[in-house]
Amino acid sequence: MISVPTGVRVWLATGHTDMRKGFASLSLQVQEVLRRDPLCGHLFCFRGRRGNLLKVIWHDGQGACLFTKRLERGRFLWPSPADDVVTISSAQLGYLLSGIDWRHPQETWRPTSVG
């Protein structure tokens, strides 16, 4: 995963988004629906209707980057549409992209002894 620079916020657009959208239409959605500046350097995440596809748009100061991830199994856990827009930490973004519940991450069990 590409590391998120310090001070960059990660925004989740609640609800579902048409995953056919590209740079221009996702940037417009950031402006009009989320009421944020798509050129500010923050990451904006969008999830498709089925929940297994995620797009992240980010302007790094030189140009726009569009990242896409599709889960082979399962769905990305997403906030309810009533929340409008949610901000998460870069660590929570790592959990989200791994398919882990970013709201309540739990340590996985590790054996303490052999045998």
Q: Which residues does each PLM region occupy?
A:
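Polybasic/polar functional segments that serve as interface/processing modules
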Residues: 1-115
